[in-house]
């Protein structure tokens, strides 16, 4: 047989499109041609594969070899196709039975000795292989990650000779058995460690219950960062699909996806981060912080210290839950359904309104400082809370609400939302909002009058409605009442003061 086809997977964002590696041997002067839009690392695989085959004891065909990576319009990069190319050459030259490659996908980079090295982005490929009902061959170091795709048969190999012996029937391999030891609970910091700040804790409860974005404003040392770091522990546990989605993102980003499996991400980029670092980018697009925070929390401390153009790129993903990065050779889509928590000081020195009277900032300095945050960005933050200085006691607080107690209330509210509309309140579209956030006529007129008095936009009013819906869910009430609207409006009315 002079033609063989082996299936593999490319990496495009967090997707893994199928790539067919076609190997054809023809008569003529010995040569090896690789086509199908390969990048440098893929073109270099010709030399790696040749040395690996020879050092493993196989014959390298002295014929005219053509390798095609289809589809031709899909860019291919990295050494992930080495193993597929080697198996294709072996099958096309008759050193392996061609039928053994049916229903098989493989990933792996070859060393010159024939050893198989790990590659990144294995989990998205494993999920795609499972959907295609194929068996997956991966390097042994990637096997635990690939096994997260439940129902997929995985073969883990260290050397080219192992998979060749399996395909020839001389030394059959057993499917990899996942250890399952890396799914231990991750201890989140407890909310009870934060002393006082009842109003801020109430806002944190509302934010967790409805997946609302939150802005904490106050002097230094009042507990803004402590409060933000407690939010992931209040959120409901990830379900299997969400956990796999998060793990797939970290697999693509070269992070170990099992390190905190299956915990909600908490990302805290420095205020000097660039726009590509925040939303993703590069000649070969990689996920940024907003994608790494998918299904979790993105915490931006010292919000006005970020460059304004960096903050403005958050506006689209805050609405759509995804980010699209366009390049000359195509567009890459990354998920970005994160919960934004931001913290800021009220003025450049940080002590505006502090009882100590230490603030010496002029009104112009305060206005210029706050002017770094655009109105459209602030409108997309549902809850604006002032965190004021309280007790300075070094003794641990007693009687503080624990994370377990708050997370139980959050879980009950989220269950009501999922049963009613299939998503958290913050993610309601316009039609679903009108359907699930209906008001009595008197309450509707009251909210409209408040919006006119405070000069709120229609988007701000919609977000007030969603927060009010969350407040009603926390009380297990079906109808939104005036007091829910008043509290939701309070979080909005303190925005720009």
Model-derived features with residue positions:
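Residues immediately C-terminal
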Residues: 112, 298-299, 305-306, 392
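The Walker A (P-loop) glycine that initiates the GxxxxGKT/S ATP-binding motif of P-loop NTPases
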Residues: 218, 280, 302
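Walker A/P-loop
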Residues: 216-258, 320
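Basic, amphipathic alpha-helical bundle interface domains used for macromolecular binding and assembly
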Residues: 35-46, 61, 68-78, 285, ...
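Walker B catalytic acidic pair
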Residues: 295, 301-302, 313
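P-loop NTPase nucleotide-binding/switch module
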Residues: 168-206, 210, 240-290
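Peripheral, non-AAA+ core regions of ATP-driven protein-machinery
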Residues: 1-215, 219-226, 326, 479-497
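Conserved catalytic network of the ASCE P-loop NTPase/AAA+ motor domain
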Residues: 26, 57-60, 97-99, 129-131, ...
């Amino acid at each position: 047989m002079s033609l063989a086809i082996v299936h593999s997977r490319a990496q495009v964002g967090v997707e893994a499109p199928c790539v067919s590696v076609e190997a054809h041997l023809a008569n003529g002067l010995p040569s090896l041609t690789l086509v199908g839009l390969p990048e440098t690392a893929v073109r270099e695989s010709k030399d790696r594969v040749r040395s690996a085959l020879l050092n493993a004891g196989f014959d390298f065909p002295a014929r005219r070899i053509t390798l095609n990576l289809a589809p031709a319009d899909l860019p291919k990069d990295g050494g992930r196709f080495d193993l597929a190319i080697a198996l294709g050459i072996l099958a096309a030259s008759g050193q392996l039975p061609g039928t053994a490659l049916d229903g098989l996908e493989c990933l792996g980079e070859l060393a010159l000795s024939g050893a198989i090295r790990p590659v990144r982005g294995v989990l998205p490929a494993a999920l795609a292989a499972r959907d295609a009902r194929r068996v997956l061959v991966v390097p042994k170091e990637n096997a635990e990650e690939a096994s997260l795709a439940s129902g997929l048969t995985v073969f883990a190999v260290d050397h080219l000779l192992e998979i060749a012996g399996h395909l020839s029937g001389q030394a059959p391999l057993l499917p990899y058995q996942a250890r399952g030891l890396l799914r231990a609970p991750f201890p989140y910091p407890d909310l009870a460690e934060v002393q006082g700040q009842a109003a801020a804790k109430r806002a944190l409860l509302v934010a967790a219950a409805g997946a609302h974005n939150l802005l904490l404003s106050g002097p230094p040392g009042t507990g803004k960062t402590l409060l933000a770091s407690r939010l992931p522990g209040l959120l409901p546990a990830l379900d299997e699909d969400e956990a796999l989605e998060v793990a797939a993102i970290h697999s693509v980003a070269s992070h170990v996806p099992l390190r905190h499996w299956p915990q909600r991400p908490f990302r805290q980029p420095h205020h000097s981060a660039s726009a590509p670092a925040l939303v993703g980018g590069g000649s070969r697009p990689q996920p940024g912080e907003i994608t790494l925070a998918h299904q979790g929390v993105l915490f931006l401390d010292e919000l006005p210290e970020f460059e304004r153009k960096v903050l403005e790129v958050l506006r689209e993903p805050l609405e759509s839950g995804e980010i699209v990065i366009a390049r000359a050779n195509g567009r890459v889509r990354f998920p970005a359904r994160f919960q934004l928590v931001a913290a800021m000081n009220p003025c450049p020195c940080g002590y505006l309104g502090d009882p100590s009277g230490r603030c010496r900032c002029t009104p112009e300095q305060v206005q210029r400082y706050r002017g770094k945050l655009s109105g459209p960005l602030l409108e997309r933050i549902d809850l604006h809370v002032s965190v004021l200085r309280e007790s300075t006691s070094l003794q641990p607080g007693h009687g503080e609400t624990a994370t377990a107690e708050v997370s139980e209330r959050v879980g009950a509210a989220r269950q009501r939302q999922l049963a009613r509309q299939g998503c958290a309140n913050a993610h309601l579209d316009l039609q679903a909002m009108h359907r699930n956030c209906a008001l009595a006529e008197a309450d509707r007129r009251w909210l409209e009058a408040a919006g006119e008095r405070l000069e709120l936009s229609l988007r701000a009013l919609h977000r007030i409605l969603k927060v009010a819906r969350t407040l009603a869910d926390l009380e297990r009430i079906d109808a939104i009442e005036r007091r829910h609207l008043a509290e939701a409006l309070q979080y909005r009315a303190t925005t720009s003061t």
